[in-house]
Swiss-Prot record:
Phylogenetic placement of the source organism: Bacteria, Pseudomonadati, Acidobacteriota, Terriglobia, Bryobacterales
GO BP annotations, alphabetical order: ATP synthesis coupled electron transport
Membrane protein topology class: Multi-pass membrane protein
Entry-linked PANTHER family: NADH DEHYDROGENASE (PTHR22773)
Compartments it resides in: Cell inner membrane
The protein's name: NADH-quinone oxidoreductase subunit N 1
Amino acid sequence: MPVSPAFNPQDALRFLPEIILTVMGTLLMVLDPVIHKRSSNAFGHISLIALVMALGASIYAYGIAGPAFGGMLMVDGFATFFRVVVITVGILTVFPSYRFLARQDAETSEYHALLLFSIAGQCLMAASNDLIMVFIGLEISSIASYVLAGYLRDDKRANEAALKYFLLGSFATGFFLYGVAWIYGLTRSVNLSVVRGVFQHQPVDPTFVGIAAALMFVGLAFKVSAAPFQIWAPDVYQGAPTPVSAFLSAGPKAAAFAIFLRIFMTAFEPISDKWQPLVWTAALASMCIGNFAAILQTNIKRMLAYSSIAHAGYVLVALTAHSETGVAAAMFYLAGYAFMNVGAFAAVSVLTGKGERYQNIDDFKGMGRKQPLAAAMFTIFLLSLLGVPLTGGFFGKFYIFKAALDSHLIWLTVLGLLNSAVGAYYYLRILVVMYMYEPGEAADAAEPLAPSLAFALILPALGTLALGIFPGWVLEFATKSAANLK
């Protein structure tokens, strides 16, 4: 469908979530000299207001869905779904950040501004229908995330995490951009709809097409921490502040998968035979490396990092299915994953104590008695990550493996189920430590649960259970959005 390049006033309304987040992020930095440091929680309140406004704007924009800015953006159900997911991740990240920033006596305005800028980039990624816009959104999100990872400037682990994240992330972005250059050279366009049309109706050298797809796959696989490009994730998740680790594990990953799905299921859909074997291999490698490496970990944050690699593999299984059902399953899974993983890291933020001193799994002995609410919420998140019924994780995995079976991916489904069984060991090990051992030093040093941290635990737990008990409405919207993804 041809799209007029002329400006339409509705374009600004369709772009409203990104405008709100950018303006409010800038406002936070402008207000920094004005607001007294003792009132630093005000920056968190402003950040929450901005995110709620952006959430409302995303829902409003869906009511006037359509292309914007000459077709560079596409505000549809797919974009709205992922906008809501990444903004929700931002809201859930703000709550544990209150206590973290107060404990560290860190600057709050810059932290929340970077958070808003990163989410703005992720929203742009979700709505992009043009490879240049994808790149811009990717860079906005990534640059802010690099700084957040090293936000504690006096912490050597945080500095190391930020440096590794920046260097490897820049390298991966180079691969992605080089792939974009190949696509432009082959099709004379960076618009996804036009690229799809060229691949469908014009002869293109299959070797060059395969190279372009592989280059872009490498760049995106890094962003979602999929094997064999996952090496950065454990060090970054361990070294970054725990609320930042929660954010990085869910928000940027969901946005990157939105790009993955939109590019590979629209522009690259006619050449699926070129990329399906690559995605199949990455899915299996991610599940195996993530789950088996997680078994060996003693640090809770590194364990969750390897767990996130395995979960990236599950989503890649849905992409390998190459079907509307697979896309819908991936969308549902990422929504559930956002709740359970942000919640898990929020629980870790509580249970590791002041300064995150107690990060070893053995330090969690007896936490079920000393921190009953945090331990109970952590249990819900771990069971959801495992895929136990009545949680969002169960239905997420069920829909993914069903989509894989429908596409006759028998071996990948079997291997995925076996990997899920392997995951039971390291998730249940934490529950055993928390509930079946006498309290240790960390449990004895436990502090009262702050209201902001209680919210950070209860809200994602409710989301996780809601998706496990009433999955239909989210899956229905995801299915409708996937059907319109062209």
